[in-house]
Amino acid sequence: MIPTTVLSNNVEMPLIGLGTTHSGGYYHDAVLHSIKKCGYRLIDTAKRYGVEKQLGIAVKNCSVPREEMFLSTKLWPVDCGDEVYNAFQTSCEKLQTDYLDMYMIHMPQLPDWIVNQKETKEKTWRQMELLYEDEHVRSIGVSNYSIEDLDELLEFASILPHANQVELHPWFHQADLKNYCDELGILTMGYCPLAKGKYLEDETLCKIASKYQKSPAQICLRWSIQQNVPTVPKSTDCRRLKENTNVFDFELSAEDMNTLNSFSSQNRKIVDLSNICQKMSLPDGYKLNGRVFGVPEEDETIPKSCSKCAQKQNVPLPVCI
């Protein structure tokens, strides 16, 4: 069982979850393997990724009771204001659930065509609060919010976000933002915890990994959870899916934590959100490029390719099938 942390409203959240961003495609077999064989219970997704329907099928067919799962998805900014409830309902229908464990606003930015930006942000958050008050969701949160974005939210929020999900790894650990969230009782969640693998061959990181007889990726994940930061690495590889959960049998020393913290002086942010407003009107899941593999054939409503098709097309499929 993957250990949990506790949100400010006493809701428990697993410290390691499965990320499902649309980059790299969707592999149904990998999702099922993560739940059934590796013990994942936190599934983190977003309307934007275009895989909610596929994940709903996986959760339905995984044989794990819904109440043992922690489903988290996100509101895309085009569904702001009065559209929040409809967007929530659509996500729930696709995920085949009547409630969410966490519902987050994906971005602080709104589309350029919104005239009254601050008023719309306030209305959007109020709709999120109503979902929580009416017990449609167990917690509400935000994603990619800076200190300035949170300050703006605090001007009108009756209920503070239970979490703020941001890019967070040793090369970009946003200590000031995390400390600010800690002061407010907002849990910091991390995405992109391995920096997309760009620096896993770093000499210092590899020395630390050798010391603990762990992989560099496990050291990065341990660095996150040791700060009480739930994190959601994405993988479609069976071995790595399991490896990512084997980070609870050791503890990094204070010296090694400080060494890893020092990597952030390089300020190597991986995810570029600078032009996000120009991309808001693109279709959900546009990065999938049709790479949806292994969804059961009886679910004809979902555009997909089976695992055999993936192999015929020479698509890498490093999962147990």
From Swiss-Prot:
Site entry: Lowers pKa of active site Tyr: 74
One cellular component (GO) term of this entry: cytosol
Keywords from the named record: Oxidoreductase
Pfam families: Aldo_ket_red (PF00248)
GO molecular function: aldose reductase (NADPH) activity
EC number(s) stated in the UniProt entry for this protein: 1.-.-.-
Active-site residue list: 49
Superkingdom of the organism of origin: Eukaryota
Amino-acid positions noted as binding substrate in the UniProt annotation, renumbered to this chain: 106
CDD domains according to UniProt: AKR_CeZK1290-like
Family, per entry: Belongs to the aldo/keto reductase family.
PANTHER family to which the protein is assigned, alphabetical: 2,5-DIKETO-D-GLUCONIC ACID REDUCTASE, ZGC:110366
Record's protein name: Uncharacterized oxidoreductase ZK1290.5
Lineage: Eukaryota, Metazoa, Ecdysozoa, Nematoda, Chromadorea
